[in-house]
Curated annotation (Swiss-Prot):
The keyword Plastid does not apply. InterPro entries: Metallo-B-lactamas, RibonucZ/Hydroxyglut_hydro, UPF0173, UPF0173_UPF0282_UlaG_hydrolase. Keywords: Hydrolase. Disulfide bonds: none annotated. Belongs to the UPF0173 family. GO terms for molecular function: hydrolase activity. SUPFAM superfamilies: Metallo-hydrolase/oxidoreductase (SSF56281). PANTHER family: UPF0173 METAL-DEPENDENT HYDROLASE MJ1163, UPF0173 METAL-DEPENDENT HYDROLASE MJ1163-RELATED. The keyword Hydrolase applies. It holds the Pfam family Lactamase_B_2. This is UPF0173 metal-dependent hydrolase Pars_0810.
Amino acid sequence: MQIRWYGHAAFMVETGGAKLLIDPWITNPLSPASPQEVINAKPTHILITHDHFDHLGESVDIAKATGAPIVGSFELMLEVAEKGIPEAQTMPMNIGGTIKLGDGVEVYMTPALHTANRGAPSGFVVATPEGTVYHAGDTALFRDMELIGELYDIDVALLPIGSVYTMGPREAAIAVQLLRPRRVVPMHYNTFPLIRQDPEDFKARVEAVSRAKVFVMKPGDVLKL
């Protein structure tokens, strides 16, 4: 398994023959890639946590170019259908639900404490034979993260630390305590001035309360499991 960060909350999780593109705002100011480069990478599925512009991103254009199905909440799938995505190319689900993508890859939709234009914001747990990744989406800290950690043996947690619109470093470090992942990658920070944070501060906070290993990635970096 490998996880590539495109900046902000955009990631590509590759495992076996699956390439799961999550929250593809590829034109974000930190991204080293263009939408065409991501299209050329041929994602097999596109996962969207909610419909704010910085998460919906270029998902519709990428889906149209590649034929990759879009996974997200029922209401969000109605929204992308209005933008020209055929119903057959959508995979609607809801919080607490599970879908199987084949080759042993399963996607669980988790709660997130945030807002959305349509539908409920969410996170995703991607469970594969090579490891399990939790993408928290945009969220505040919430106690049921402990339950997510109990239900899923998380190898990598992708957590927002930018504050203002999500939890900040202090709260995200507590989230690590609740989730108990083996590895943590901070995300959703330094994309614009309002969410400027020092990821090393987050790393120090986590190391003070947890044995999880923090990987401070640069946009374009790849984490291999």
